[in-house]
Design a protein with these regions (language model features):
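Active-site core of glycosidic bond-cleaving carbohydrate-active enzymes
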Residues: 24-56, 129, 176-177, 181-192, ...
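Glycine- and aromatic-rich loop/turn segments at beta-sheet edges
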Residues: 2-17, 58-71, 81-90, 140-167, ...
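Aromatic-rich carbohydrate-recognition surfaces in CAZymes
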Residues: 9, 18-151, 156, 168-193, ...
Length: 404
């Protein structure tokens, strides 16, 4: 369309050329676009402008620009007109089946461009209206449930989230935290844009969602996986990556996502139950007694290996510990994972998506740019927000200076 300027073009990353060929799968870019923002911000802005112009009329961020999972239905049902799309298609966007978490991926990437630019007001002016539009869409996906809906799966529990091969129902710890983080980002942008009314709405949604999670999910040791109020069905599994929302607020230099004492207690629980199973990473799901959750049953359905974890998620969890003052634990956790991938299993230029925590063997994925999440670690090691490395004497500033 006319929005695509010759000087911009459309820049997009391929999720995995050999295993999942598609352009700009939005959670993959959430995990992996930080070095683009640091070193090639014009390319990152080109991608962001495509996300904006591919956004649906009601505010849904696009799932992909095109490729092997191009689908039009949040349920995951394929639309036949999308099936022939090439792996490198750039003009067949759809809202996909992770609608409840596509929003934080989009909003976080927008905020990265703004924060890393030194809070450039022109960038804020261009991006904020779309952050607002998507935030309204995301927070009303289950509007009929009132405050609980802010931290719940969409109406009817339709679709899935980043951990897409699992059951998610009702109020969900992982989704809830991501939504609360999105509200923190949107509130700051609204305040800086002079949109006081929307900033107040974000605070209201945040307060309501936070109270709902504390009431229904906190059990004294961790946030249980999910609770469906309409049926009283719940999953009390320990989801090791339940604090992703907290990492986002830390990395973006924002106030807490979860109460501080809850974060510290949950991290201690997650560390304790995983220590007996793996030296190189944390299992995704464990039973309440700390044993590995069985694959093929209940929440895990039939896809994830009980000992498997996503490497990019492990890096975020390692940074959770760093931001809580435990650099001596968090940094070696990330290092052990990379040592296993690169030195033991020799995937130096072939970054996998998931590995087993007990053996380090790859369970899925080749050439995954999610692994560029590594570029978020320098800020976390120093306890800085993402803008730290771009400031005077920061790592990114020094690298660019050396290259010039």
């Amino acid at each position: 369309g006319d929005w695509c300027k010759p000087e911009d073009g459309v820049f997009g990353m391929n999720e995995s050329p050999r295993d999942c060929p598609q352009i700009e799968c939005i959670p993959c870019s959430f995990y992996g676009n930080q070095p683009l923002v640091y070193f090639y911000p014009k390319l990152a802005m080109s991608t962001m402008r495509a996300y904006i112009n591919y956004m649906t009329y009601d505010g849904a961020a696009p799932w992909v620009f095109g490729g092997c999972t191009a689908r039009s239905e949040p349920s995951g049902a394929r639309n036949e007109r999308h099936l022939p799309t090439a792996a490198c298609a750039m003009n067949v966007p759809c809202r996909g089946y992770q609608t409840t978490t596509n929003g934080i991926s989009f909003v976080a990437m927008a905020d990265r461009l703004w924060v890393s630019s030194g809070y450039d007001q022109e960038i804020l002016k261009e991006l904020y209206p779309w952050v607002k539009k998507n935030t309204i869409y995301t927070m009303t996906l289950r509007a009929e449930e009132g405050p609980d809906g802010v931290v719940s799966m969409p109406t009817g529990n339709v679709g899935t989230e980043w951990f897409e091969h699992c059951q998610w129902k009702g109020i969900v710890a992982h989704v809830g935290g991501l939504h609360l983080a999105q509200l923190r980002i949107a509130e700051r942008m609204a305040e800086e844009s002079g949109d006081k009314n929307f900033a107040a709405m974000c605070r209201m949604w945040f307060d309501e969602g936070s109270k709902s999670m504390e009431k229904h999910l906190w059990n004294g040791r961790y946030y249980i996986n999910f609770f469906e109020p309409s049926t009283n069905e719940k999953s009390d599994l320990i989801f090791s990556y339940q604090l992703d929302g907290e990492w986002i607020t830390d990395f973006h230099g924002l106030p807490y996502c979860f109460p501080k004492d809850r974060v510290q207690t949950a991290l201690a629980t997650i560390r304790e139950v995983n220590s007996r199973h793996s030296d190189i990473g944390f299992l995704s799901f464990l039973n309440a007694d700390g044993s590995p959750a069985s694959g093929g049953e209940g929440v895990m359905k039939d896809w994830y290996d009980p000992f498997a974890f996503f490497n990019a998620e492990l890096f975020m969890l390692a940074m959770n510990y760093m931001y809580e003052g435990q650099v001596e634990f968090g940094l070696p956790l990330a290092e052990k994972c990379m040592n296993s991938i690169v030195c033991k299993h020799l995937h130096t230029w072939d970054m996998p998506n998931m590995i087993r925590g007990d053996t380090g063997e790859v369970t899925f994925g080749k050439d995954y740019y999610q692994m560029l999440m590594l570029w978020s670690l320098p800020a976390a090691v120093k306890g800085q927000d993402m803008g730290g490395p771009t400031r005077e004497d920061g790592l990114v500033t020094r690298m660019i200076s050396a290259a010039n």
